[in-house]
Amino acid sequence: MEPAALIHLLDEYFTKFDELAVAHGMEKLKTIGDAYMCVGGLPETNRTHPIDACFMGLAMQAFAEQMKRQRDKFRLPSLELRVGVHTGPVMSGIVGKHKFTYDIWGDAVNIASRLETNGTPGRVNVSESTHHRVKELFVTEARGTIDAKNKGQLAMFFVNRIKPEFSADAEGRVPDERFQSRRSGVASASSQWPTIPAATS
């Protein structure tokens, strides 16, 4: 792919991800090459961020699938997407002198990055910490462990869809009223740690 075409394609994906971040209450942090990073539960604290981050991850993959179908019709290349999500403690703040940047630091950021790197294209790969907070509402799939530096073995799970009993559509992407009711209860039991979705194409 020509550089100009690649930049245009990345812009199309990242513009959509920006829209999804706003829709799901996530805070965009940065893009690094073809990677997109955002956080939930910061800078304004809330208790729904693990659920919101998984929703955004599923929505990102749905968009990537849609783009592939559209571009396949014209035999154009598309991007495959890996999404990694982790919930854990971080430090956050604004840094810089001429270009102010809101950013986060900590082991949780590194774990989210490892989850993305060890993810599978087309899937949402989450940590045990995130899985614990969303498993009542989403269909999940255990997928083994990876070795995380200074953390030992890190369990990973795929988040596949909303559970059928809480879904308003066949694909498990639209929540129904029962989901929203349960969401409040699940969220109130969640910690205040932020959730970090990281994606790369």
How would you name each of these model-derived features?
Residues 68, 86-87, 107-128:
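Catalytic/regulatory signature loops of cyclic-dinucleotide turnover enzymes
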Residues 1-55:
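Catalytic NTP-binding/metal-coordinating core of nucleotidyl cyclase/transferase enzymes
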Residues 24-32, 63-84, 145-146:
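Catalytic core regions of nucleotide second-messenger enzymes
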Residues 73, 95-105:
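Short, surface-exposed loop/helix-turn segments at secondary-structure junctions
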Residues 90-92, 118-201:
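Cytosolic regulatory/linker segments at or just downstream of nucleotide-handling modules
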Residues 17, 33, 60, 85, ...:
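Residue-level signature of catalytic and energy-coupling elements of molecular machines
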Residues 39, 77-93:
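A short glycine-enriched loop-to-beta-strand structural element that forms part of the catalytic core
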Residues 60-63, 67-70, 97, 118-122, ...:
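Conserved, well-folded catalytic cores of nucleic-acid-processing
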